[in-house]
Amino acid sequence: MKKKKLFLGTIISCVVLALSACGSSDNVVTSKVGNITEKELSKELRQKYGESTLYQMVLSKALLDKYKVSDEEAKKQVEEAKDKMGDNFKSTLEQVGLKNEDELKEKMKPEIAFEKAIKATVTEKDVKDNYKPEMKVSHILVKDEKTAKEVKEKVNNGEDFAALAKQYSEDTGSKEQGGEITGFAPGQTVKEFEEAAYKLDAGQVSEPVKTTYGYHIIKVTDKKELKPFDEVKDSIRKDIEQQRLQDTTGKWKQQVVNELLKDADIKVNDKEFKNTFEFLEKK
């Protein structure tokens, strides 16, 4: 899904660039109610899409200047796009004014470079900070401390944790599974929760832990032995890379953009677009 979105974003840019290249008085449309010239169309596109297109063009140059993308890498992405779009692939190329797959490869290179840039944000420290044992974790989330203490007391008295989660937990995503958090891993929960969870051994239950969501009673149901760092460091790095590529907050994408464009020493000579990169001055 992600790569399909990238592909569609690329071809939309192609449409804008192709149409805004027009500038003559030739008619694009004739009708009884009036004609539309290429110059009029070009002006309209420039006003509506010029700033965003200029931004994308400069960003693409900055990306490809720092992160090189080979023809083979681009070809692989094109093949994946063909598989996803099926019979619509060829007609889509024609619609956006691309003559062949080679032209599309060039248009997709900045997107590939962007992925490389985000992956490059992962440091050795990030990998070491995520070097933690695999665990299965369950929790019961309640709104107030009083309820949290009452539920913890029930756990201490031997009541079933999963049953209590179904009865009390406010977390609709886990309560019906007895509080089990699917795919618990470093960086996927708030700091207070994560720190408390990793301090527990298998079978242990925490005291109430306060976070922005409320109060959690955390139980570690399984905790595997930590493997040697050299055996798992590559896997850890790949996991972090995927988390950042899929990050819905846009944090890592914006970090990459800000750093690249600041280093690019951009000067806009066209008054109409003088504010395109003003956000960099505020950082």
Swiss-Prot record:
Pfam families: Rotamase_3 (PF13616). Residues 132-222 form the PpiC domain. It is a lipid-anchor. It is an enzyme of class 5 (isomerase). InterPro entries: Foldase_PrsA, PPIase_dom_sf, PPIase_PpiC, PrsA_foldase, Trigger_fact/SurA_dom_sf. A lipid is attached at C22 (S-diacylglycerol cysteine). Its EC number is 5.2.1.8. SUPFAM superfamilies: FKBP-like (SSF54534), Triger factor/SurA peptide-binding domain-like (SSF109998). Residues 1-21 form the signal peptide. It comes from the Bacteria. The keyword Thylakoid does not apply. One of its GO terms (molecular function) is peptidyl-prolyl cis-trans isomerase activity. Plays a major role in protein secretion by helping the post-translocational extracellular folding of several secreted proteins. Important for the secretion of the protective antigen. The three PsrA proteins in this organism show different but overlapping substrate specificities. Belongs to the PrsA family. HAMAP family: Foldase_PrsA. This is Foldase protein PrsA 3. It comes from Bacillus anthracis. The gene is prsA3.
